[in-house]
Regions:
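Generic structural motif
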Residues: 11, 19, 35-37, 67
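Helical mechanochemical/support elements of P-loop NTPase systems and associated helical scaffolds
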Residues: 51-54, 58, 75, 98, ...
Length: 133
């Protein structure tokens, strides 16, 4: 089995190419076989008013592509700039690896994995901002 594997909880919703799909009563596992399908877990959605930090803004931009509200071409250059800026702030090795993974995924047009890597930076960003305040 190849492709993206999604593990869904009961009643969890996902957006697949613009269609909202809700899981049933039990946990399930889905294999997405179409390589360029746009997938977004609705539990992971960042609302526009919450996109106030650099990582959240980058996540939100990727999310717009996955939801179909923006095209990959419209966001690619701005996202690459955002990711480059993040690489100047997050200098530890683990964060750099996540940033490199996000950048590589974006270059391949793999927005799902780009978002996944960027979301992994959110707790680190929160810690940095907490120290600053």
């Amino acid at each position: 089995m190849s492709g993206l594997i999604l593990k869904l909880g009961p009643k969890e919703r996902i957006l697949v190419n613009g269609a909202v799909i809700e899981n049933g009563e039990r946990r399930s596992r889905l294999a997405i076989m179409t390589p360029d399908a746009n997938i977004l877990r609705l539990r992971d959605v960042i609302h526009p008013e919450d996109a106030k930090t650099p990582v959240r803004r980058a996540c939100y931009a990727v999310q717009l592509v996955l939801s179909g509200d923006a095209t990959a071409n419209e966001t690619k250059h701005a996202l690459l700039r955002n990711i480059e800026e993040l690489s100047q702030v997050f200098v530890d090795m683990d964060s750099r690896q996540l940033i490199d993974t996000a950048s590589g995924a974006l270059s391949r047009g793999d927005h799902y994995h780009c978002l996944k890597s960027l979301r992994s930076l959110l707790p680190r960003e929160e810690r940095l901002l907490a120290v600053r305040n």
